[in-house]
């Protein structure tokens, strides 16, 4: 019997009310959603041609939390996108703190030939690296706080395989956290 359903990612513009309803109705659908936002600044999102605003993004999350309070989120962030100001970055940090993403995959913008942003003036590398480090430290703190809440709790794990170590098994919880358990069974 199929125990869990998980899908990798969805674009915010494709996250319809119908999909939100599926999250409510399908108990096997895991309560972790990877919903790439890229930035907390509407200015940067527009420059990236992302087709969603922060307000629309937050509205999706509000609807999801309303129908499934245990839902958690992960996201992708591009730090140092051309034209990103200190204020734009602070808006991204503010979003991170507000949503408390349990996983935040963050990277410094890198120019790619053939893309509209390729010829735009890049953010100074030193500033971009400082911002990324700041952002990742905040992300780590949020993730640590989240994981502390799991300590001493009994949670369902779907085991995937045995590890190389004798009597240890690898699995994941419903929020896709890795778990290793020692057992003689």
Regions found by a protein language model. Name each.
Residues 57, 89-92, 128:
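Aromatic/hydrophobic pocket-lining residues that form the small-molecule binding cavity
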Residues 14-18, 37-48, 79-86, 102-128, ...:
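Flexible glycine/acidic-rich beta-alpha junction loops that bind and position SAM and/or redox cofactors
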Residues 35, 76, 96, 104, ...:
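Hydrophobic, well-ordered secondary-structure elements that form the walls
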Residues 23-25, 92, 121-124:
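Short, hinge-like loop/turn segments at secondary-structure boundaries
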Residues 30-32, 72-74, 101-102, 152-154, ...:
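Active-site lining segments that contact anionic ligands and/or coordinate catalytic metals
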Residues 119-185:
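Terminal RNA-binding accessory module
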Residues 1-86, 97:
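Conserved SAM/AdoMet-binding glycine-rich loop
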